[in-house]
Amino acid sequence: MINMNNTEIGYGNHALTPPIDGCFVAGSLTAIIGANGAGKSTLLKTLAGLQPAVAGQITFTGGRVPQMAYLPQQAELDRQFPIVVQDVVAMGCWPQSGLLGGINHQSRQRINQALSAVGMQDMARQPVGELSGGQLQRVLFARLLVQQAQLILLDEPFTGIDSQTVGLLLEVIHQLHTEGRTIIAVLHDMSMVEEHFPHALWLTPQGHCWQSAEQVLVQWHHSHGSSCSFSSRPSILRAINL
């Protein structure tokens, strides 16, 4: 479990969010939503330990930070770096083998299985600079699979990629969730949140709403001039424009 106690997220002494209180339950699948500049990506970076909180605390149950995998937005990645697909995926083995530890037979099997899971097994020797956006995202998800992390942080993982890849990666996310991983994703597509994410954290300049996705989205749609009704599946909400 990740606990946030009066935590303000931002840069330096400048907070992007009011104090946040709540927790990400172990094994949960949570979407972070909010307007541009609300602090969504900054929150992920703070959870990943890449920058400190402006105020308050972030603590982990048992006092130990779990093994985590962080996937930033594609715009933050250097696609010109001369590396091939299988070597990118092999980076997921580093937490176990170390940077200079080499890839053993067991790790090689994990890499091949991960590439197969995302449909990229035939492009293992392809330079990443020659991949489409969707293909690159599949490779990065394969690296996540190899990492075997308990905490997975995804920053806009479906932006700018084709619908077939989106569907495949959602299957990967659901499989990881079934295995008990804790997954936190920044998303902009409310229909995707409604259909696939049981929990949501909505960040606004005035505060935050952190409940089940159903409860959060009722408030989100209300604030945007729409309302929600339950579909035939109790856990799914649909927006009805007024």
Task: List the predicted regions and their residue ranges.
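Conserved ABC ATPase "signature" region
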Residues: 105-123
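Conserved ABC ATPase signature
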Residues: 127-131, 135
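Hydrophobic anchor residue at the start of the ABC signature
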Residues: 141
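Catalytic Walker B motif of ABC-type/P-loop ATPase nucleotide-binding domains
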Residues: 152-156
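Helix N-cap at the start of a conserved alpha-helix in ABC-type nucleotide-binding domains
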Residues: 163-165
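H-loop/switch region of ABC-family ATPase nucleotide-binding domains
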Residues: 187-188
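H-loop (His-switch) and adjacent beta-strand-loop-beta switch element
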Residues: 197-214
